[in-house]
C-alpha cells in the first residue's frame, strides 16, 4: 500500500524532472518578452496585439486545455475497455473531429472578426480597434494548431512522458525570438501575430515524434459515432469555462483596459506574463503529473490513495506559490525594470507595470490551487462543479472590475482577479468536501503556516538586494548595468530560495525532506562511479 510519504515523493521526483524543461522554456520566454518590450514597448500596436491575442488565444486555449484535460479520462476508458490499439484509434479520431471544429471556428473568425474583437477591445479607440480586427483575422489559424497540440499533450501525459510536454515552450519562444531579432522591423505587429501562429505549429511538430516513440501511429479516422470521442466532447463543454477562467478574466480585464488610454492594455499584458511565468514553470508541472495519477486512483474508486495524492499536490503548490508571491511583491520593481525598461518601453511604463504585477501576484496561490482542484473534480467525472465555480469566479471578477476600474486603473483590474479567484478556491474546497468527504484541512493549514513563516524569513533575505542595486547603478550604466543587476538579482533569489528550503526542512515539512532524500540518493549513487573512474 502506497503511503502519503511515497505519494509525495513520487510527485516531488516527477515535478523536479519536468520543472527543468519548463524552466529552460521560461528562460527563453523571458528573453522573448524582453525583446517584445524593446521593439514594441507599450505602444498602440502592442495594445492591439495584446487585445487580439486575448481573443484568439482565449479561443485557442479553450480548445487546447479542454482537449488535453478530457483526453486522459476518455483515453483511459478506451484503453481499459479495448486495449492499447483502441487508444490510437481514439486519438486519431479525436484529432479529426477537433480539426473539423477548428476549421469552422477559423472560418467564422475570418468572416466575423469585428464581433470577436468586441470580446476584448470594445472600449478601444477606432484606430486600435481596426488593428485588432486585422490581427484577429491573421491569428485565427492558431485554433487548429492548438487543437493538435492539445491532443498530443494528452497522449504524452497519459503515457507518463512529461518531459516533452514540459519542453513545448522552447519551440514556441524560439519562433518568437527569431522573428523579433531578424524580421520585426520589416513586418511589424502583423508579423508578431504570424510568429504566434507558427510558434504553436512548431510545438505540434516537436510533440509528434515524441508521441510516436511511445506508440502513436497517425491514421485517417473519422468516426463520429465513437462513444469515447462523444464522451470527450461532452466532458469538454463545461471544461471550456472551468480550465480557462484565468483567460476569461484576462480578456475581461484587457477589454476594460482598452478604454483607459494608450499603454494600459500592454501594461496588463506584460505584468500578467511575468506573473503567469511562475504558474507556467511549476504549477503546470504539478498538474500535468498529478492528473493521470488522480484519474487512475479516484477514477477506479481508490479514494484513500487519491486523497493522499491530492494532499501532496495542494501542499506542493502552496510551498511554491506562497514564497513566489512574497518574492514578486518585494522584487517587482527590479524584475520589471530588468525585463522590460529599455527601447520603446519607458520608465513610466515600468512604474505602472510594477504596481500592476504586485496586484497580480496576489492571485498566484489561488489560481494554482484552483487548477489542482479542478483536476480532482475531472478525475471523479464531475465537470459541472468546476464549471459553476468558474462562472462564479468570472461574475465576481467582472463585478469588482466595474466597481474599481475607474478609480484604481490597471491595479484595480489585477486585484479583482486575485480577490475573485481566492473566493472561488474557498467555494471549490467546500463543495469538494461535500462530494468526497474529509480533505485533511488541518494538514493544509499546518503547511500554510509553515510556508508563510519560511517565506517571511526568505523575504527578509531578498531585501538585501536593494542596497547593492544602488551601488551597481552608481558604478555602471547601459547594458553592463542591466546585466549586473540581473546576475545579482538571480544570486539573491537563489540564496533566498536556499534559506526558504532550509527553513521548511527544519520545520519538518515531509515533502521537502522527500526532495532532499532524492538529491542525497542521486549523489550517493554517483560516488562509486566517480571512484571507479
Mark where each language-model region is.
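Membrane-embedded alpha-helical bundles of multi-pass transporters/translocases
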Residues: 1-533
Amino acid at each position: 500500500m502506497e503511503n502519503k510519504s511515497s505519494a509525495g515523493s513520487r510527485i516531488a521526483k516527477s515535478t523536479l524532472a519536468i520543472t527543468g524543461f519548463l524552466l529552460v522554456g521560461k528562460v527563453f520566454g523571458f528573453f522573448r518578452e524582453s525583446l517584445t518590450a524593446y521593439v514594441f514597448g507599450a505602444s498602440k500596436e502592442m495594445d492591439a496585439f495584446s487585445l487580439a491575442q486575448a481573443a484568439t488565444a482565449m479561443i485557442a486555449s479553450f480548445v487546447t486545455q479542454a482537449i488535453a484535460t478530457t483526453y486522459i479520462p476518455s483515453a483511459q476508458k478506451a484503453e481499459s475497455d479495448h486495449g492499447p490499439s483502441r487508444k490510437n484509434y481514439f486519438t486519431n479520431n479525436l484529432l479529426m473531429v477537433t480539426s473539423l471544429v477548428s476549421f469552422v471556428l477559423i472560418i467564422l473568425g475570418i468572416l466575423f472578426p469585428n464581433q470577436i474583437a468586441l470580446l476584448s477591445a470594445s472600449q478601444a479607440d477606432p484606430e486600435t480597434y481596426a488593428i485588432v480586427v486585422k490581427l484577429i483575422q491573421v491569428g485565427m489559424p492558431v485554433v487548429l494548431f492548438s487543437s493538435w497540440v492539445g491532443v498530443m499533450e494528452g497522449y504524452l501525459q497519459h503515457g507518463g512522458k512529461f518531459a516533452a510536454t514540459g519542453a513545448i515552450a522552447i519551440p514556441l519562444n524560439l519562433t518568437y525570438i527569431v522573428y523579433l531579432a531578424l524580421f520585426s522591423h520589416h513586418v511589424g505587429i502583423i508579423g508578431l501575430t504570424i510568429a504566434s501562429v507558427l510558434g504553436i505549429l512548431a510545438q505540434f511538430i516537436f510533440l509528434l515524434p515524441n508521441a510516436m516513440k511511445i506508440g502513436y501511429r497517425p491514421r485517417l479516422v473519422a468516426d463520429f459515432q465513437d462513444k469515447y470521442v462523444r464522451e470527450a466532447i461532452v466532458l469538454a463543454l463545461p471544461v471550456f469555462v472551468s480550465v480557462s477562467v484565468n483567460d476569461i478574466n484576462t480578456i475581461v480585464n484587457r477589454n476594460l483596459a482598452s478604454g483607459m488610454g494608450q499603454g494600459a492594455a500592454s501594461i496588463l499584458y506584460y505584468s500578467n506574463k511575468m506573473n503567469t511565468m511562475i504558474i507556467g514553470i511549476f504549477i503546470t508541472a504539478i498538474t500535468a503529473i498529478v492528473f493521470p495519477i488522480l484519474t487512475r486512483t479516484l477514477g477506479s474508486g481508490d479514494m484513500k490513495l487519491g486523497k493522499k495524492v491530492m494532499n501532496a499536490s495542494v501542499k506542493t503548490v502552496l510551498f511554491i506559490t506562497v514564497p513566489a508571491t512574497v518574492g514578486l511583491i518585494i522584487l517587482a520593481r527590479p524584475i520589471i525594470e530588468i525585463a522590460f525598461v529599455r527601447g520603446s518601453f519607458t520608465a513610466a511604463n515600468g512604474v505602472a507595470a510594477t504596481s500592476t504585477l504586485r496586484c497580480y501576484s496576489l492571485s498566484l496561490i489561488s489560481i494554482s490551487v484552483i487548477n489542482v482542484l479542478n483536476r480532482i473534480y475531472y478525475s471523479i467525472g464531475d465537470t459541472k462543479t468546476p464549471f459553476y465555480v468558474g462562472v462564479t469566479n468570472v461574475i465576481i471578477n467582472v463585478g469588482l472590475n466595474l466597481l474599481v476600474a475607474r478609480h484604481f486603473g490597471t491595479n484595480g483590474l489585477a486585484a479583482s482577479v486575485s480577490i475573485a479567484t481566492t473566493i472561488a478556491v474557498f467555494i471549490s474546497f467546500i463543495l469538494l468536501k461535500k462530494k468526497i468527504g474529509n480533505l485533511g484541512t488541518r494538514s493544509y493549514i499546518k503547511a500554510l503556516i509553515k510556508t508563510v513563516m519560511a517565506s517571511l524569513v526568505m523575504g527578509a533575505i531578498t531585501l538585501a538586494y536593494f542596497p547593492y542595486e544602488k551601488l551597481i547603478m552608481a558604478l555602471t550604466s547601459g547594458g553592463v548595468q542591466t546585466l549586473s543587476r540581473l546576475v545579482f538579482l538571480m544570486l539573491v533569489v537563489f540564496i533566498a530560495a536556499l534559506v526558504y528550503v532550509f527553513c521548511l526542512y527544519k520545520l519538518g515539512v515531509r515533502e521537502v525532506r522527500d526532495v532532499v532524500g532524492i538529491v542525497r540518493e542521486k549523489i550517493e549513487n554517483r560516488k562509486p562511479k566517480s571512484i571507479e573512474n
